[in-house]
């Protein structure tokens, strides 16, 4: 039992070998004190500053109406900042918007593919739009079809595809010109879990090839799995920033929960007193639960060993155990007080953005 527990508590974080950028990295995205105020006086973005290094995968989280959509539309040149500056790949979004657009891929919440066309036809149109040299188009199309695993259906109309397949095709269309930076705005909203997981794999492939990815998402486990770093937005301001692990460390420690077979109050009191008396657990918190006990400790593996020694000495039979670690949901709740996941922007925010787009 103890060996199984140690295996459970030693599982790696959702994304291992995170490469947090250093000051030596060149910046792919440089936003400095960005404000965006709408015509009605509403300030949707209030002093956002972001440094995103080349090759980084950044997650951008926030509750409804926090300003996520407004921020990303400003970064991709669909809105001008009212105050502050934004540089993408070294180009200023206000004075050099066309250069910015040519150097990025932008996947909006709404699918941009033509469902009446095939993947191959959609990609060919995208190549023409982005000015991919004609002698390179066929090779790029085949490479992208392989990347998103649509080669076998490359000549079937996209309207026959599942939502996940359409998202994968949409992903491919924003990559035809090989942009060094890709912006993904709620890319997996509405997909079932299996489809989301497959799309995640393709995003990881894109990032592993050196592409910088800026992701807004309503799925916190998505950010945990994919992102090197996360920024949390509320009321148009960034209120927290860091790696998923560092943010989770701020809200608590791991919890070991043990259920006894046929527990009695007397038995639980006796065991809890014995566990609290263990010197190696002086930094742990031990509490009674309806079925047994719960132990919160900085080192849950060490705590588990001590707890199981006490239970063995007390001849207490165990029916189940579990280890819970802090999640980004816990971080999000502690920061925003919102018990819902970071969700899609409000209709008001999207409507305002649509009426104040930068002229192309």
Describe these PLM feature segments.
Residues 27-31, 36-221, 225-234, 239-240:
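ABC transporter nucleotide-binding domains
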């Amino acid at each position: 039992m103890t060996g199984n527990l140690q295996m459970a508590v030693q599982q790696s974080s959702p994304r291992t070998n995170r490469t947090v950028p250093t000051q030596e990295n060149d910046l792919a995205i440089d936003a400095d004190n960005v404000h965006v105020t709408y015509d009605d006086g509403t300030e949707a973005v209030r002093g956002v500053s972001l440094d995103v290094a080349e090759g980084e995968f950044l997650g951008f989280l926030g509750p409804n109406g926090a300003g996520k959509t407004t921020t990303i539309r400003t970064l991709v040149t669909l809105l001008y900042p009212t105050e502050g500056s934004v540089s993408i790949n070294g180009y200023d979004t206000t004075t050099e918007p066309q250069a910015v657009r040519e150097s990025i891929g932008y996947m909006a919440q709404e699918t941009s593919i033509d469902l009446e066309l095939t993947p191959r036809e959609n990609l060919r149109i995208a190549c023409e739009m982005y000015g991919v040299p004609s002698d390179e188009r066929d090779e790029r199309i085949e490479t992208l079809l392989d990347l998103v695993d649509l080669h076998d259906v490359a000549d079937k109309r996209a309207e026959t595809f599942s939502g996940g397949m359409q998202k994968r095709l949409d992903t491919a269309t924003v990559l035809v010109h090989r942009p060094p930076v890709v912006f993904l705005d709620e890319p997996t909203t509405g997909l079932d879990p299996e489809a989301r997981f497959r799309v995640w794999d393709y995003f990881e492939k894109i990032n592993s090839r050196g592409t910088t990815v800026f992701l807004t998402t309503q799925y916190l486990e998505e950010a945990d799995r994919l992102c090197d770093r996360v920024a949390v937005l509320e009321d148009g301001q960034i209120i927290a920033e860091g790696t998923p692990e560092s943010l989770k460390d701020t809200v608590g420690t791991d919890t070991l929960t043990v259920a006894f077979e046929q527990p009695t109050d007397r038995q639980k009191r006796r065991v809890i007193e014995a566990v609290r008396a263990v010197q190696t657990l002086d930094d742990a918190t031990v509490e009674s639960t309806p079925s047994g006990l719960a132990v919160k400790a900085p080192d849950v593996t060490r705590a588990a060993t001590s707890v199981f020694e006490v239970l063995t000495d007390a001849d207490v039979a165990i029916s189940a155990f579990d280890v819970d670690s802090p999640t980004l949901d816990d971080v999000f709740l502690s920061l925003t007080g919102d018990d819902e996941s970071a969700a899609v922007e409000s209709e008001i925010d999207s409507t305002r953005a649509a009426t104040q787009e930068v002229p192309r």
